[in-house]
Amino acid sequence: MTNIRKTHPLAKIINNTFIDLPTPSNISSWWNFGSLLGLCLIMQILTGLFLAMHYTPDTTTAFSSVTHICRDVNYGWLIRYLHANGASMFFICLYAHVGRALYYGSYTFQETWNIGILLLFTLMATAFVGYVLPWGQMSFWGATVITNLLSAIPYIGSTLVEWIWGGFSVDKATLTRFFAFHFILPFIILTLAVIHLLFLHETGSNNPTGIPSNTDKIPFHPYYTIKDTLGALILILTSLTLTLFTPDLLGDPDNYTPANPLNTPAHIKPEWYFLFAYAILRSIPNKLGGVLALLLSILVLAFIPMLHTSKQRSMMFRPFSQLLFWMLVADFLTLTWIGGQPVEHPYMLPGQLASILYFLLILVLMPTASLIENKLLKW
């Protein structure tokens, strides 16, 4: 008798995705982040669902409802902080996942890569609207500042901003619609993630060498289910450690002050995972220019497959490209640090230089290094 997992219509899909999937035998732990992102998404949807049961999307009660969750709901504090820190874990895994794709040339899977960029944008939108929900000072002012950026769009800017706000300022209508967006977007992310996986399984996974591995494949289960389980345990342990010992480490103290439209915080900044893009936005003195640079800081990923000039797929055997890649990582961290600092003397110039370097590395230096490496192959 044939095994039911290979014949049953539903079980067959699961089997071909997670059990009998032919996988390269040499993929490293950098390939764990895809499954970890799936785990993060499931954790966020579950904790978010329980939070939504007690949260009220109203300007007068939103802040108190979050306090009520933390004080009066059974393990509400745990659910709330798991959700808040889960977002940080999500972005750590995401940046590692994108970094790995850049390093090993996985972006040559064009469809998978493009869906990935779409996923990144959707995730950033979800995190942004979610940060507004507790209705603290940073929630309110973050929403005001970031939505206001749309007013830089010629002709329709101001109308667009008021349309998003649902009035003439960030108010009850804004909070209600942001809650609606924050509830629906994770399910859109889930759908996109399935499509992402679907496209990936059309081609099969890449591997550290970047060389086709069709002659050397092993079943996903038990080899990579074990490997992914270890990654999952490390993720859960890190998440719990962060949540139980330093729940507010990555948050902003200003968000413990209820939103007050009459009092602007000294330094408005988003959550840490947006700081690199925020630093790029602030490094340009012109409003429209800043908004375009902010958009391009993520959209630039879409140009990477077109800028792949190397004869090799992976950076494993390309020392110049490796050096530039790690420069890009250092630049990303520098931008993240500068985005969290006030716009004043020592930070402005390094921020502008780091922003220029960010685009220069991706658009000019890395493709040029690849061409030089191609020449060196002939030596």
From Swiss-Prot:
**Which cofactor is recorded for it?**
heme b
Which compartment or compartments is the protein found in? Mitochondrion inner membrane
Keywords per UniProt: Electron transport, Heme, Iron, Membrane, Metal-binding, Mitochondrion, Mitochondrion inner membrane, Respiratory chain, Transmembrane, Transmembrane helix, Transport, Ubiquinone
Main localization of the protein described in the UniProt heading: mitochondrion
Which InterPro entries does the record cross-reference, listed alphabetically?
Cyt_b/b6_C, Cyt_b/b6_C_sf, Cyt_b/b6_N, Cytb/b6-like_sf, Cytochrome_b, Cytochrome_b_C_euk/bac, Cytochrome_b_N_euk/bac, Di-haem_cyt_TM
Q: Does the keyword Heme apply?
A: yes
Q: Which residues bind heme b b562?
A: H83, H182
Q: Name a single GO biological process.
A: mitochondrial electron transport, ubiquinol to cytochrome c
Regions crossing the membrane:
33-53, 77-98, 113-133, 178-198, 226-246, 288-308, 320-340, 347-367
Record bears the keyword Protease: no
Which free-text remark accompanies the cofactor? Binds 2 heme b groups non-covalently.
Q: Which PANTHER family match?
A: CYTOCHROME B
- Explain the purpose of this protein: Component of the ubiquinol-cytochrome c reductase complex (complex III or cytochrome b-c1 complex) that is part of the mitochondrial respiratory chain. The b-c1 complex mediates electron transfer from ubiquinol to cytochrome c. Contributes to the generation of a proton gradient across the mitochondrial membrane that is then used for ATP synthesis.
Q: Which family does it belong to?
A: Belongs to the cytochrome b family.
Instruction: Report quaternary structure and partners.
Output: The cytochrome bc1 complex contains 11 subunits: 3 respiratory subunits (MT-CYB, CYC1 and UQCRFS1), 2 core proteins (UQCRC1 and UQCRC2) and 6 low-molecular weight proteins (UQCRH/QCR6, UQCRB/QCR7, UQCRQ/QCR8, UQCR10/QCR9, UQCR11/QCR10 and a cleavage product of UQCRFS1). This cytochrome bc1 complex then forms a dimer.
Q: How is this protein named in the record?
A: Cytochrome b
Q: What species is given as this protein's source?
A: Platanista minor
